[in-house]
Amino acid sequence: MITTCLFLVACSKPASNNRMNQNQDVIALHFGEQGIQDFAKNSNTLVDRQPAGMNFLSLDWTPPKLGRVRVFSEKSNLEIENVISVLGTQVARRSNDGIQIMDIDASLHSNEYTTSQEAYTAYTKLVHQINDKQWKQYFLPFSARIDKQDNLKHMTETMGEVIDLTYILSFKEWQDVLSKTNRLVFNLYNGDVELGISLRRTYKDDKKEQYMVRYSFENFKYAGRNAISDSDKMNSEQLKQAFETEVANNKKARKTEENNMKKEGYHIDESYIDPDIWPYVK
């Protein structure tokens, strides 16, 4: 069986100018123009300009010495430990918008392997931080708003997708869910940023386990405009109209999805209201 192991992959890479100082403090990373400056300050590697219109900026660490970063949204932040790599994305045609996407690969634990109990402790620490820093549950605008009472049912039936951020699994529940899914998935937002977290168990035997975490941050300005075809060619009035059409279409799709989920025994959280992303899109 092939096991995903970013520790081993990273260790096999040749040394590069982009390897980070292993003893540095937490690196602050922002979106927008400040984000470009953050990457430039902490990396000697040139921007990777791709023909498809995306510019990539990266930071890397060599295990076993891993990094720490703090990613800032408009209103909060998230601190990430045991970081292996950070990839920041700038849209070339909208270069003045700066960094719009950040993908971060990290280990859940500081050593290459850990125990189930230690991994569980690290999971609870992550969930506490999510709540303490007021990240909120995010449903994609076309997806069903599943009620919190169906959290465990939803996790086991959808490969670990969490819908109640305030609920911390017991150790037994943690073991039971992972035995069925091998992962947990969080969909969050805070201010101008949406965040997907995928926590995966990548190895397990009788003595040790390994967990990797992917943090995918996306600015709502990019996400909103990217959902609209040719948004860059529109004036402000056309963009507003296209955005409203997109919202209406999403509502129709959501209604259909929620009706389907009700047939499967799920409850819908009618109180959930989508974040207003228009101020960021326009």
Go through each PLM region and give its residues.
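C-terminal motif of bacterial Sec signal peptides marking the signal peptidase cleavage site
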Residues: 8-10
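Amphipathic alpha-helical segments
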Residues: 21-23, 30-48, 117-141
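Compositionally biased, flexible interaction segments
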Residues: 47-88, 105-108, 114-115, 122, ...
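Bacterial signal peptide processing site
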Residues: 12-15
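Ser/Thr-rich, low-complexity intrinsically disordered terminal regions
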Residues: 25-28, 37-78, 139-191, 233, ...
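Long, charged/polar, surface-exposed segments that mediate recognition or autoinhibition
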Residues: 85-165, 181, 207-244, 248
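Sec-dependent signal peptide recognition
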Residues: 1-4
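C-terminal interaction module
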Residues: 170, 176-282
